[in-house]
């Protein structure tokens, strides 16, 4: 009998164990299924791992943190940055509330075994990314474990405390219960599980609406304690970071205003009451230049304004990144709807921009219209690229540029600033939008002097007037940047690929052509106007700070034009005069002006040395730079460094004519700087030129036994007893042997820029076609390293480097090629695989 009873008990125990194991398996499967829905961070984040030892944080190494999900388990894994294999940390993420995010880059927690750990991220974005992964894992685990009430399993696993499973039950929303409600909410906020339960309870019971109804009564009774408690409760609800809950808080104007009123009574500042509602209800802040007839859009505009105020002022101290993201998403979708309405409502747009066509229109209304357009453009910049482009193109189509003519010529400084801000927003986004407008005007015009040219000249004239007269340094910088973008060759400013827009999509070839037309019109009608202050400059000492700021930006602009507008700048003798005038700015007592002038001279010289060097010799610019060097030789500042670098460039890259000029005209001044290594070496090179019968065209740090690719006669003279070896080197240095290397470097080989006759070898190879926007007049010293098997010589040595000007290559045909012609040629080349 006893034996039978023992057998039954044993079977019962086995059944219980089996049932428990089955429930554990079901729980694991459910958790695994929930975790599979979580998005794992796509980018490992750089992080330092710390462990607490003896009350001190010990650095355990630096690596890259990533999230990983394995079945029902989720982990933080940190791999060492040294080898990407050593695991510095692998910790299981659990649902218990043991994690905290501190400052912007720290995640700190205590493991179940009592070990304190911390992750210090290099960037706040990385910390947010991993924190969101952790929060999602905890929510997924909690949502599953709440549906299982087997206390034994939960206790054995140690995953959750049974208190987390208690059902949330708040006291009734009445004045008498506010203290109890505050304490209960505070308790539920302490764990992830209870916070989720609180969210569900508040949403299901319509608790917030019933609670908000108490606010007017509390204000009428002037019960400050209850108002403070009500504020604390609402702040806790906001911190739950639940999108539907926040949406219910701000779903309509009435409720939003109640929430703003409650948050005026912050218990952290008991003696101060904010005036949020007064600010939000001020109707003077809302102006309609053109009435908006759609009540739905009007409501969204008002709601967006209030949400922005709540985000930036009211709750900025109490919400974290997830809550900000929720508020930002509300604002973003509202703004997208508003922009869509404005973009598609032709009646509204026609009425708005017709204000600037009617001469008798009220000036105040025109000003308000400019500020309205500025706000719309600023909102559009935060939208997707395509939406923003569509809005800007629509505005330009409806004669936005006419409105900008008004704004940028206005006497009011704020109106001018708004107009320039609008223009910069558009051309910074995509200059082709403006180019296309002028091209369309040109096509529509019947007269020889097209409306496009007149309109463009008006726009550029306004920009030039602002640049010449504006006293605000910020606006000057903005207008200068606008010129660079508006007058950039397609692909030469900010984008590496000439056939790509800012969003990466393929640019229409037509956009490139109309961009070139725009630049041609600028040089025909506006270039001299822009350069006028520099061309008229006579005396620097009489200039005030405002004028000097303007000259600084002009130097930057013309430096940019000289380097980028190769085709046009070669045909303008103005640059000779400009260089002499810019050199006068070297005598200014303002360091930033001196640096701008020196940067112009140095950059232009590096871009096209042969031409710029002749200009500088004619205008004695070298002498003025030397005067500057003598002035600052004992100073320790950026001007000294920049001037010294200029002469270091001449030492290593200067032509024989330049050094001979310095020797004949400024020998004593150079000798006075002989204590500087740059000038002592420069003098040695000059002295070597006087006694060296070779007289190389390019002066550098040449050795006496160096080989030169200057022709057969020189080679025979210098190599002497090794002529055959020299011919072998020249023959090996061919297109075929250098194909792979030239592809890696992405430039033409040395032979591409040297006439075959000058190398005494036959032109047996077809010249490769060149990219359209390549600067054909500037070739840095070739940097090649041929293999020992092919030649046995390292051609990267500066002894074998040559600039195109040193070989006097006849490239007049390339000079005369217009960008449009080169664009057409390159388009066909691209089809054959040559275009970059």
From Swiss-Prot:
Database matches in InterPro entries: EVH1_PP4R3, P4R3-like_central_dom, PH-like_dom_sf, PP4R3-like
Annotated GO biological process: DNA damage response; negative regulation of sister chromatid cohesion; regulation of double-strand break repair; signaling
Chain intervals with Polar residues compositional bias: 789-799, 825-836
UniProt keyword list: Nucleus
GO molecular function: protein phosphatase activator activity
Localization (cell): Nucleus
Pfam families xref list: EVH1_PP4R3 (PF22972), PP4R3 (PF04802)
Domain of life of the organism encoding this protein: Eukaryota
A single GO cellular-component term on record: nucleoplasm
Region (Disordered): 1-25, 692-718, 789-836
Database matches in Gene3D superfamilies: Pleckstrin-homology domain (PH domain)/Phosphotyrosine-binding domain (PTB) (2.30.29.30)
Protein's name in the database: Uncharacterized protein C216.01c
UniProt organism field: Schizosaccharomyces pombe (strain 972 / ATCC 24843) (Fission yeast)
